Structures are given as C-alpha cells and as structure tokens.
C-alpha cells in the first residue's frame, strides 16, 4: 500500500488558449502523476459537466478556478491517505463527494484530472509505464490512427457542415509505418490545396479548413446539391492518397467521417446544412431517412470505413436504421449518442443503434467509468475508439489508454499542432518499448464489420 500524500490543482491553458484544470499527485513512496483535462467544442447533451466560473470579466467566463478550488479544498482532503493503487476507491470517493449524475457539483474537469493523475502516480511508484499498469501483459496492441485532415463544422471556419474528414492507414504493417503514410498523405493534401489556391490554415485539431471557392462557379443551392462540400472533401482525400503513392481502400488508406449531426438537427427534426444555407440564403434540409440515404450514397461512392455521429444524438430510430442499412460494411460510431456513458451504451447495444463507441474520458469523468464503458462496448462485439477533444494539451494519457485496453483505434487529430503530435509520439515510444511484441492490426481492428 502506498498512500496519497498530496494533491494540488491549478488553472492552465489548453490548445485554444482556454483555461483547463491540471492536477498533480504525490504518493508516500515517491510516486508522482500529473494530468490535464481536455475540452470539447461540440458536446453531447448528456456529457458530464465541465465546470466553468461564468465570470465574464475573466477569460470570457471560461475560467476554471471553481473546479480548481473544488479539487484543492473538497476532493484533496478526502483522498489523502487512500491507497494510490486502489483506483476504484479513489474514483468512488469522488463520485460520492459530487453526488450528481453528471458531476455538476464538483465538475468533471477537476474530477477527471485527479483520477488520471492518481493512476499516473501509481504507475510511477511501481516504475512501469501507464499502459502496463492499466493493461498488464495483454497491453500490446497499437491503434490504427484516425487522422483528421480536413476540418469543418464547429471545428473550423470553413464551408463544410460535416465536422471531420479523416484518413485511416489500414493497410500499413506497423504503427510507425501508418504514421509515415499519414504524414505523407497530409503533405500531399496540402500541396493539392495550394495548387487550387485554397486555404492551408489548420483548424482546432490540426486539419486543413478549406473554403472550396474553386469548386463552385455559382454559389447557389443547385450547385451545392449537385456536388456537396462533403463530396468535394472526399474527392480531395482520394486524390491526396493517390498523390502520396498509396491506394484508396482496404489495401491502403481508407476514410472516416465525423458528421457531428447533432449540430445540424433543428427543432423541425430535420438536418440543416447551415453553412450552405448561410451562403445561399436558401434552406436545405434533410429528413432522417434522407440523411441516411445521403450517407449510404457517400459510402457507395468512396472508400469510407467509419462514420461517427451520422445522425443526431436524439435520433435513436435513425441510428438503428443507419446501422441496419450499412453497419455490416461501415463502422457506425456513437459519440454524442453515448457520451462514454455505460447507461447510454447499454441502451444503444439493446437497440442495435451502432457498432462502435467513441471513448472520451471527460464525457464521463473518471478512469474507472471510462474502463467500464470500454469493457461494455467490447463485450458486445463493438469496437471502442479512444478519442481526444478539440481543446487539448500536451497530456498523452489517451495514447496509453488505447494500448492498455487494446482498443485498436485512436482518434487524436492531424499531422500538425504539437498537442496532437504529442499523442502520436507517445505511441511511437510505446511501440519501441514493446519491440517485437507490438501488434498493429490494420484492417483487422474492424472486427465489427463483414470485411
């Protein structure tokens, strides 16, 4: 037994220059852990609360001094003396202190940072990497990266309503090779955008945020309907993959999308392409069935292997229909739908509303609950995709988590911005440490599909 001796929280800044919580933990025998809470831009209604101060005179109301104070004055005194290796007790104590379903009293940003810092301190004391502390001898599978190279939606000031267009190097033989393929494709995409005199500035997650001015002679609704911005983005990705010297498809690089459709779903229960509506001053909306047909069309025309949040978080019936239609050949990922919450994941499994769960630690708020969500997902025969948030730090915990629980997939941004690259570099370190024991499944990571 090694007791927690000290816990200290402070306010720091994330990749957007917005405050977040950092927590340090020390144990009696020299263990030390430090963790930083991430933050999302598009959030699900059932996510655990990210506690903000609300003082408009300071950081536009986004300060986290309340969450920091809760850690230092409420959580820390209760955890001092508890065994650092007893993660369940640590997390349960914090859940009891908060006492609310969505951690609205103490804030999930503070609770999560403490939970992760304790785990890191325990691993430090045992002098083993975090992934081995959490996963033991089974922790040896490197994830297929899901790299966000074109940003839209809430993540960028671009013409694209869908939030993320990603590449997945499923044909690579190792994680390091997968990263090389991804980097070369990212640079090829940049070259293509430059040749079209488009913007090569990057969004929150390091992907490009093009305006596609070159793709449309007229900015009227019929032009956008004839070739949607999503199709322009997909065409670009296929061209970039080829330009980099790789095959679009199962033997090379496939494509994933995050539609973030909850952001498009309005009170009329239709999906509105808001950015197109703004440009054209005309309404363009789809019913749930029409959106499903549109996504099916994209899947039939492009090498797409994964679609996240293809429908809104309240459109459970639509998710079930989408999974029935294309779930045998495409990974249907629930993010806003499940918010890493075992309660909603169980509901999704029963309804057959998806075949994959996105795992975001700050959506649920503790390491123990995150592990429960991963375990429930995998037992159902679904995949679990460990994910970052759009507001990140240099914290690399999710890299260790993906390996610890052999999730096989990780979503952590593009090939730019050090807050994203830090996770990839950590995975390269882990691959090196594992040596010949390292496994990279590639296409086999999609065990939920009929390949």
From Swiss-Prot:
The active site is at 205 (proton donor), 360 (proton acceptor). SMART domains: Enolase_C (SM01192), Enolase_N (SM01193). One of its GO terms (molecular function) is phosphopyruvate hydratase activity. It is found in: Cytoplasm; Secreted; Cell surface. It catalyses: (2R)-2-phosphoglycerate = phosphoenolpyruvate + H2O. GO terms for biological process: glycolytic process. Mg(2+) binds at residues 258, 308, 335. Its EC number is 4.2.1.11. Pfam families: Enolase_C, Enolase_N. It comes from the Bacteria. GO terms for cellular component: cell surface; extracellular region; phosphopyruvate hydratase complex. SUPFAM superfamilies: Enolase C-terminal domain-like, Enolase N-terminal domain-like. InterPro entries: Enolase (IPR000941), Enolase-like_C_sf (IPR036849), Enolase-like_N (IPR029017), Enolase_C (IPR020810), Enolase_CS (IPR020809), Enolase_N (IPR020811). (2R)-2-phosphoglycerate binds at residues 163, 360, 389-390, 411. Pathway: Carbohydrate degradation; glycolysis; pyruvate from D-glyceraldehyde 3-phosphate: step 4/5. Keywords: Cytoplasm, Glycolysis, Lyase, Magnesium, Metal-binding, Secreted. Its cofactor is Mg(2+). Coiled coil: none annotated. Binds a second Mg(2+) ion via substrate during catalysis. Belongs to the enolase family. HAMAP family: Enolase. Catalyzes the reversible conversion of 2-phosphoglycerate (2-PG) into phosphoenolpyruvate (PEP). It is essential for the degradation of carbohydrates via glycolysis. This is Enolase. It comes from Mycoplasma capricolum subsp. capricolum (strain California kid / ATCC 27343 / NCTC 10154). The gene is eno.
């Amino acid at each position: 037994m090694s007791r927690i001796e000290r816990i200290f929280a402070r306010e720091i800044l994330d990749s957007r220059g917005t405050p977040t919580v950092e927590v340090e933990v020390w144990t009696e025998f020299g263990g030390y852990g430090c963790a930083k809470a991430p933050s999302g831009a598009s959030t699900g209604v059932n996510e655990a609360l990210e506690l903000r101060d609300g003082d408009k005179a300071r950081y536009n109301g986004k300060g986290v001094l309340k969450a920091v104070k809760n850690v230092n004055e409420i959580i820390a005194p209760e955890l001092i003396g508890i065994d650092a290796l007893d993660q369940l007790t640590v997390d349960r104590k914090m859940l009891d202190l908060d006492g609310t379903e969505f951690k609205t009293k103490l804030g999930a940003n503070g609770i999560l940072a403490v939970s992760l810092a304790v785990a890191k301190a325990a691993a430090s004391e045992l002098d083993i990497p975090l992934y081995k502390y959490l996963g033991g001898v089974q922790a040896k599978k490197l994830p297929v990266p899901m790299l966000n190279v074109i940003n839209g939606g809430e993540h960028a000031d671009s013409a694209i309503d869908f939030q993320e267009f990603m590449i997945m190097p499923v044909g690579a033989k190792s994680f390091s090779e997968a990263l090389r393929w991804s980097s070369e494709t990212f640079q090829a995409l940049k070259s293509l955008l430059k040749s079209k005199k488009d913007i090569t500035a990057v969004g929150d997650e390091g992907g490009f945020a093009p305006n596609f001015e070159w793709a449309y002679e007229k900015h009227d609704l019929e032009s956008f309907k004839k070739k949607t911005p999503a199709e322009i983005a997909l065409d670009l990705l296929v061209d970039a993959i080829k330009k980099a010297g790789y095959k679009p498809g199962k033997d090379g690089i496939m494509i994933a999308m995050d539609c973030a459709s909850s952001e498009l779903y309005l009170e009329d229960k239709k999906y509105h392409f808001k950015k197109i509506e703004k440009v054209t001053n005309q309404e363009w909306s789809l019913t749930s069935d029409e959106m499903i047909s549109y996504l099916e069309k994209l899947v039939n025309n492009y090498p797409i292997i994964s679609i996240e949040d293809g429908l809104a978080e309240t459109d459970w019936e639509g998710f079930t229909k989408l999974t029935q239609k294309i779930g045998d050949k495409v990974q249907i990922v629930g993010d806003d739908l499940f918010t890493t919450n075992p309660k909603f994941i169980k509901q999704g499994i029963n309804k057959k509303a998806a075949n994959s769960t996105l795992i975001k630690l700050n959506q649920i708020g503790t390491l123990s609950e995150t592990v429960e969500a991963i375990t429930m997902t995998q037992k159902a025969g679904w995949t679990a995709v460990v994910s970052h948030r759009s507001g990140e730090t240099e914290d690399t915990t999710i890299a260790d988590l993906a390996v610890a629980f052999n999730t096989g997939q990780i979503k952590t941004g593009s090939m730019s911005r050090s807050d994203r690259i830090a996770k990839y570099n950590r995975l390269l370190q882990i691959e090196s440490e594992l040596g010949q024991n390292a496994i990279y499944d590639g296409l086999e990571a999609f065990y939920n599909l009929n390949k």
